[in-house]
Amino acid sequence: MMQHMEERELEVKRYWNEVSDSEWYRSLRTEERLDRLQKDPKAAFYPGVLELMAKHVGDFRGKKILLPSSGDNHAAFAFALMGAQVTSADISERQLENAGQISERWNLDIEYICDDTTRLSKFGDGTFDLVYTSNGTLSWITDLAEMYRNIERVLKKGGYSAMYDVHPFTRPFTMEAWKAPEIRKSYDDVFPDLYWRVQDIVNASARAGLRILEMAEIRSADASFWYTFDELKTKTAEETANINDWKHNPMAAIPAWIAMIAQKQA
C-alpha cells in the first residue's frame, strides 16, 4: 500500500513538473496577467470565493495562511498582497520555483515548501489561521479523510478550512457546451477518477472535527469552464456569447463550482 502511494506521488510530481512550463501555465504567468493580479489581488479568486472566506475569517492582514496544492500560486500572491503571512505548499518543485521567481520580483515574503497535500508532513500542529485549497486539488487526492484530518491538525484552534473546486454535480456528465446533457457515469462512481461527491467532502471535513459554517454553489462566470486552453484560443466572442445562460447552453443549468468554509473547534 505504501509503495503504491509513493509511486503515485512520484507520478503526480513528474506530471506537474512538466505541466508547470506548458503553454497553458506560461499563459498564467504573462506580464499582463500578473500585472492585473498585482493591481487587484481579488482577481486571483473566482467570484464569490474570496467574499465567502472574508465573511468568516475577516481581515487577512497578519493571518497565517497555508495553500496546499498551490498550483499557479495566484492565490498565494493575492493573500500576500493583502498582508497575510503565506506558506505555499505543492508536490511540484517546478511550480514552486516558478512562483518563487515572481514573489521575489515583487518582494513578497512567501514561504515555499514541497509537500504532499494529503499528509502535510512538513507542518506542525496548530500553525495556521486558514488553510485554503482551490480548483483542481480534490481530483488528485486519493484519501480525502486523511487530507482533512491533517488540515484540521495544522490549523490553530478556531482556525478555518476553505475549499473551492469543480462542483461534483458536474461529474456524471460530459459537460459539452451547447449540447443536451449526456450522462457518462453514475454520480456514485467515484473511482477510478477520484471524483469526490458532495457528501464525501462534507463528511470528511466533519469527521476530521471541522464544523461546516457555509457552502456556496457557484455558476460559471466565463467560457474557460467549458473549453480547454487550446480550444479557447480558437473561439470568437460570438461563439462564447450566452455560454453561461442555460436557455442557450443546457449544461449551464447546474452549478459549475462549489465552495465551503469550516472551522476548527476553539
Predicted regions, residues:
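A short SAM/SAH-binding and catalytic strip from SAM-dependent methyltransferases
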Residues: 129-145
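Short alpha-helix
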Residues: 192-215
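Core SAM-dependent methyltransferase catalytic element
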Residues: 208-210, 231-233, 248-266
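A short acidic, Gly/Pro-enriched loop at the edge of an enzyme's catalytic core
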Residues: 121-130
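A short glycine-rich, Lys/Arg-flanked "PGG" loop and its adjoining helix->strand segment in the class I
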Residues: 145-160
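Conserved class I S-adenosyl-L-methionine
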Residues: 2-61, 74, 78, 160-189
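Class I SAM-dependent methyltransferase SAM/SAH-binding core
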Residues: 64-119
